[in-house]
Regions:
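N-terminal secretory signal peptides and thylakoid transit peptides that target proteins
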Residues: 1-17
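N-terminal cap/lid segment of alpha/beta-hydrolase-fold proteins
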Residues: 28-57
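Short, surface-exposed "cap/lid" segments of acyl-processing enzymes
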Residues: 56-61, 65-97
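Conserved acidic catalytic loop of the alpha/beta-hydrolase fold
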Residues: 127-143
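Conserved hydrolase catalytic core segment
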Residues: 148, 152-179
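Alpha/beta-hydrolase
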Residues: 186-267
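Conserved alpha/beta-hydrolase "acid-adjacent" motif
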Residues: 273-279
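Catalytic histidine-centered segment of alpha/beta-hydrolase-like enzymes
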Residues: 300-310
């Protein structure tokens, strides 16, 4: 049995009860956290890590889960958000309590990472991930890890998985888009393509952050989450890079499914306007690895991990990541 398979086996059998128990365990088990830095040439990239308990010499290895943020918000507001009085919204906390060693990073020009003259397109994001991998391997001992990307972060993750398949064990793509055909969100965004090409940054203010929660199906998220996200993100300013917007409105597809060799979970909220069901079904059908799942979640839109039904999202991801390894025929 491979190391990756044995790690998945440690988590096999966990189901929705375990996920919900993790949600309620906040008071008893506060994850340990640490900060790190990776270097991509002159660019310094901020990494953040959470797990239950500090690392100890000789401990059993834990499965590593790396979370990849999208176009408009940096890593910790995306995946480690606190919403007072509203329950658990930190994806890092949830999966740390499920036994994972959870990592994320700010891409170039986001959050705490270096500011440059670039526009932080998808290719740049994949290069960021490549720069982060030696740090994760050094600190965890893991040569392979699970990766989950959301929205343009899913594109970054898929491109990286295609470029370096030896690094990625299981791959989760949420709020993903393939060709962009049939996407009302991208059609609307394309109207501003000339402006995105003319500047490496765009306005990302409180109103724009709120629109993430309302543009597809209002009511699928608590708007208190939008306010908490804006509070957490706007400390980094009201500008964010345009590169992923240019790519998603003029350069799709940026990855071909045949090039993604890892097992894949493709997960979509039924109201998500970033991609049509037909577009995603086309991508899914062409994935070469037979170990793949396509999950559609009802009463959900683009921001699945911020939604009212986020526990269903946690469950779908955990079920996929903890899948027992297949027995070859």
């Amino acid at each position: 049995m491979t190391k990756g398979a044995s790690r998945r086996g440690l988590l096999a059998g966990a189901a929705i009860g375990g996920v919900l128990a993790a949600q309620g365990a906040a008071a008893e088990e506060t994850p340990w956290s640490a900060e790190y830095w990776a270097e991509k040439g002159p660019v310094r990239l901020y990494l953040f890590r959470k797990r239950l308990g500090a690392p100890r010499a000789g401990e059993a290895p834990r499965p590593v889960l790396f979370l990849v943020h999208g176009s408009s918000n940096s890593a910790r507001p995306s995946f480690d958000l606190t919403v007072p009085g509203k329950g658990e919204y930190s994806l890092m906390n949830v999966f740390a309590r499920l036994g994972y060693d959870v990592w994320t990073m700010d891409h170039e020009n986001y959050g705490r990472s270096s500011r440059t003259e670039g526009n932080s397109d998808i290719a740049s994001g994949a290069a960021d991930l490549a720069a982060a991998m030696p740090v994760v391997a050094r600190e965890t001992g893991a040569a392979r890890l699970h990766m989950m990307g959301e929205s343009s972060g899913a594109l970054r993750a898929a491109v990286f998985a295609a470029q370096d398949p030896a690094r990625v064990d299981r791959l989760v793509l949420t709020a993903f888009t393939y060709t962009g055909r049939g996407s009302p969100t991208l059609a609307e965004r394309a109207r501003r393509l000339d402006a995105f090409r003319a500047s490496n940054t765009r306005l990302r203010d409180r109103a724009m952050i709120r629109s993430i929660f309302t543009r597809d199906m209002p009511g699928t998220s608590d708007m208190a989450v939008a306010e908490a996200l804006a509070d957490a993100e706007l400390v980094f300013g009201d500008q964010t890079p345009t590169g992923t917007y240019v790519d998603m409105t003029s350069k799709l597809p940026v990855v071909q499914p045949e090039d993604v060799k890892a097992p894949v979970l493709l997960i979509r909220g039924e109201h998500d306007g970033i991609a049509s069901m037909a577009d995603l079904q086309d991508f899914f059908g062409r994935l070469p690895n037979g170990d793949k799942q396509f999950v559609s979640l009802s009463h959900a839109a683009h921001a699945l991990h911020y939604g009212l039904n986020r526990a269903q999202f946690w469950h779908a991801v955990q079920a996929f990541l903890s899948m027992p390894p297949p027995v070859a025929a």
